[in-house]
Design a protein with these regions (language model features):
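Gly/Pro/Ser/Thr-rich low-complexity, intrinsically disordered segments predominantly at protein N-termini
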Residues: 1-196
Length: 196
């Protein structure tokens, strides 16, 4: 079956092994085996924000063991029972990830939870980013989840607590200085991030 018919068969579940074989030129994510089409290209503002955030984070992480990657970059999130990548039912392509454990990195991307995930909301992805992916990242132990809302010029930072749950978000607006509690020294001037 080709990926074009996948969206019509949402009751069927897929794995990373199947996903890796799809070659229709479209971008897909699998969340708990359910395919999500990622084909729509991000708008110019989205891309500008991503470039500014990634370059700023890379600057702070220079000479540290952490690596910054941005989409398309596969992040495989296995449940405890999946030893083989081919059986993993979840592979996502966040807008940006920071991985500090090089053992999680391979030629196909990242296997396991990144230290930080950033998603930039768009009309086509906001429900998934705020709902489905929030729960997914929390469940898999992503230490810090950043959600940027370009229209509101805001950033919400969720940090995982000792209970394995995200607590109340730290909210930031244009002009604020956002500080990571997970990546020492990483801070973003949101005036620069949202500049046109």
């Amino acid at each position: 079956m080709g990926p074009a018919s996948l969206a019509e068969k949402m009751e069927e579940r897929f794995t990373y092994g199947q996903y890796y074989q799809w070659d229709d030129g479209e971008r897909w994510e699998l969340i708990d085996g359910v395919p999500y089409n990622m084909t729509a290209a991000p708008v110019r503002r989205h891309q500008g924000i991503l470039v500014r955030v990634s370059s700023r984070i890379e600057e702070f992480l220079r000479d540290k063991p952490c690596q910054v990657y941005f989409a398309p970059f596969d992040v495989r999130l296995p449940d405890f029972s999946e030893q083989d990548d081919n059986d993993v039912p979840t592979v996502v392509q966040p807008d940006l990830v920071v991985v500090c454990d090089e053992k999680k990195l391979d030629d196909r991307g990242c296997r396991g939870a990144p230290d930080l995930v950033l998603e930039i909301l768009s009309p086509s992805t906001s429900r998934k980013d705020i709902g489905v992916k929030f729960s997914l990242y929390e469940r898999h132990g992503v230490r810090e989840y950043w959600i940027i809302h370009p229209a509101e010029e805001s950033l919400m930072v969720f940090t995982i607590g000792e209970d394995g749950k995200y607590g109340r978000p730290q909210g930031y607006g244009r002009g604020d200085l956002a500080i990571s509690t997970v990546l020492e020294g990483v801070e973003l001037n949101l005036e620069e991030v949202f500049a046109e």
